[in-house]
Every structure is written in C-alpha cells, then in structure tokens.
Amino acid sequence: MSYPQFGYPYSSAPQFLMTTNSLSTCCESGGRTLADSGPAASAQAPVYCPVYESRLLATARHELNSAAALGVYGSPYGSSQGYGNYVTYGSEASAFYSLNSFESKDGTGSSHAGLPPTAAAAYYPYEPALSQYPYDRYGTVDSGTRRKNATRETTSTLKAWLQEHRKNPYPTKGEKIMLAIITKMTLTQVSTWFANARRRLKKENKMTWPPRNKCADEKRPYGEGEEEEAGEEESREEPLKSAKSEGHAGKDDKELELSDLEDFDPLDAETSECELKTPFQSLDSGPERIPASSDGPGTGKEASTTLRMPLGTAGGAVMDGDLERARNCLRSTVVVPDSGAEGGPPACEAKLTFAQAGAPPNLETKPRIWSLAHTATAAAATALSQTEFPSCMLKRQGPTGVSATTPASSPAVTAPSGALDRHQDSPVTSLRNWVDGVFHDPILRHSTLNQAWATAKGALLDPGPLGRNLGAGTNVLTTPLACSFPPTVPQDVPPAGASRELLATPKAGGKPFCT
C-alpha cells in the first residue's frame, strides 16, 4: 500500500512503523516486532520513538494488543506544528529521526494532509449541496444556514435598481432572485428591503407610482426600461396628492351618509327614496276637515266633520289638541248632562281618524270571531242612542249595524254615515269602547242611568209599578249576580234618587252582560 502524498511508499507489513533506517540500533533483534520489543526496551536505556497517527496504524491494528497500544501510542497528536510529541522509550534520541509534517499537494488547506476524510468531516461539515456554488458556502439563495448582512455595496445595487424603476418599484420574482444572487443576500432580505424602501418613500411623500394591490404583484403596467425625469416626477406627485385628498373627502362623505342612515326615520322619509313605509300614509301638512258625504242626514252634514291629521312633525301637537278636546267633551257631559238639546258642545263634533294606506275607507268585512263583539257593540249603540249622550260618546256604525241615532229619536245627537264614517275600526277597539262606555265612571254619573238604577232598586220591593213604568217588553235585573232576561234602558223614566247598587245593562242575542 503506497502513500504518494508522503513522497515515498509504505508497505502494509509491520515494518511500516519504522523509518527507512533499521530498528536494530534500538532493539536487540531486528526480527522482533515493535509489539514484542517495546515493553522490553522500556526497561533499558530510554529511547525516543515518534508518535504516529491513527491512519498509519490502521492496517497493523490486529498485531497490537491493547496494553502495548496504550503504552506506546496513547499520547494524542497535537496541533499542526508537526510530529513533535515524543514518548520516552529508553534509547538515545539520535537513533530516531522524526518525520516532517506533510502537506497535501492540492493546496486547499481545508484539512490536514494526514487526517482521513472521516476525521476531516468532524471538523468541517461537508455539504454537497453547497459545494457547487461559489458564494461562500451558500447553496441556494434562501439557505438558512448562514445569512449575510446587508452592506453598503449590496444595498447600492438595490438602490440603483429602485432608481431605475421609480414608476413601478415592485420587482418580480425573477428580478428578486437575480438581485439576491448578485448581492449575495437571501430572497427574504431582498423583498424586505424593497418593502421598507417603498414605505420610506411614502412617508417622505416621494411616491412616484400609483398604489396597487398586493395580489397584483406579477402585473407590471409599465415597462422596466422606462425612466422618469425630475420634472415629470414633480408633476406626477401633485395629482397623486390631490387624488389622495379627494379620496379622503369622499370617504368622509360616505361615512356621514352612513351616520345619517343610522338616524333614519321611516315616517319622515320621502316615498321616492323608500318604497315600503309605515301603513299610515301622511296627508297634507296640518289637520284637514273633510265634510261628510251626502248619504247621511242633512243635519249631520253641517254639524259634524271628520278630522284627518298627518303623522309628520306636527302630529304630536295636533293629537294633544284632540285629546284635550275629548277630555273637555267628557267634562261637559258630566257637568251639563242636558246640553244635548243645542246639539252638544262644539268640541265633540270632530272625529279623529287615520287613513290607512292601501285600504279603502268603506271596508266592512270582519272576521267571524268578532261577530259577537260587533253585535254587542251595535246593541250598545242602540241603547245609548236613546239617552242624552253627546256625539263624542257614541261609536259610529256602518250601514250593516243599527243606526247610531236618528233626528227623530234624539235631536241632540247627530250621526252622519258618510264614506269615511263607515270605516270600521279594529274589533278590539270597538269592544273596548263599548265596555268603557257602559261600565266606567263618566257614564255611570249620567242622570238617565241613575234613574235606571233607582227604578231597578224599586223593582225589588214593588214589581207592579216597575212594570208600568218600564213597559211590557222591558226586563230589569233584580239580583246582582243572576241575569236571566235581556234588559234594555227605558226611554222615558221619571227621575229618582241616585243609586249604584244594581246595574241594568243592554243585551243582545239572549245572553246578558253582567258584572
């Protein structure tokens, strides 16, 4: 086995441990191996033998036992100053000649000439992917092993490219790779540098390119070779700034519109902007008095009108006024019960109605479930119309129900039945108005009902005069809880003392209404 890098051959025999001189000068017999003569020679005069590296001892390892190997070759090899470490063997130093340090002929100097490839790999990790690139152990551009810091020379290349592409400072993927190879930087460093440069120019108001989306990185609206002069850059900066300010102003206007929409009131909006609105439609500004149609009696046309009010801004004030007018009507009913001969107080002659959008004013159809309430309401209106109540206390009925009043029966009450007056309210409202009119205090204080109470109380003691006073077809409640006959309110009852213990109520359909 020859080692040409040392300059002379070595054999694989045990004599490879010796130099070109014989070992007879330091050993008793030249035929003995170093393994046999080593321990014997150590007991005699000391000799100095050079320490050989592990590469030269690899082939003769089978002839050396562990004790001899540790005693002779246990000292490690030092640094690169040559084979200078010696072990004392008990012989004269001039008998041995140390080998000079050998260098590799290729002159790379990456590893020592005597070290095997495995030992060299322990000190210098070998990367096959990086060996073919001449950029200081960088295999690919984005290798994460070592990152080169950006220097003035590398950034000058990037600045030059940025100066040439002021119109569009967005390098493509290929241009980034090219710049990374030239500047010996990674691809991430190049992308970060360009992003920071664009941000810095924006902050300094030196933007010479239109803003673009990040997703359109590969689209280049301008050519790479186009350059821009200083005057053109200045002229380009002005429209960009003005466009920016206009954009901000438009954005503010849009935000103001959105804030206005938050306070949007459907009642105040115009019909042209929003199609679907509240079911109540706004009429003309201010309340409007509409005379009744000609199908009612003549006295009703002059005495009563219908008040239609808009639901706009002045609706609250008009409604408050109508409520106050209704309260005055109730007060006048209690204080002056016999004022119906003059037609009632003028404040009670106006009726507040709402015109519902999409519904005809003369709608007469009702669900069947409210037929009982409708009948009871009609009967109550018939009974109450024969008393001296003003018109504001009566519920106006359509042509299908019983007429509210007639001029012959009571000249104090006028009830025109025009198209707007025939408009039916909600059945719940009709029933509630009937209950309120029959059972609540303002009506109970009326003199006619008080006469009925007194008459009913007298019927408990003497039913004969009661029958004569009320007539043949009239029944009166004789017990507070049991109701077995339909009572009605008499038309002509003589006055009597006030009493509220018993209640005479109107009834329709054979079923009495009791409290």
From Swiss-Prot:
One of its GO terms (molecular function) is DNA-binding transcription factor activity, RNA polymerase II-specific. Residues 224-236 have a biased composition (Acidic residues). It comes from the Eukaryota. GO terms for biological process: cell differentiation; establishment of animal organ orientation; heart development; negative regulation of transcription by RNA polymerase II; regulation of transcription by RNA polymerase II. Keywords: Developmental protein, Differentiation, DNA-binding, Homeobox, Nucleus. Residues 205-258, 278-307, 398-425 are annotated as: Disordered. Belongs to the TALE/IRO homeobox family. This is Iroquois-class homeodomain protein IRX-4. It comes from Mus musculus. The gene is Irx4.
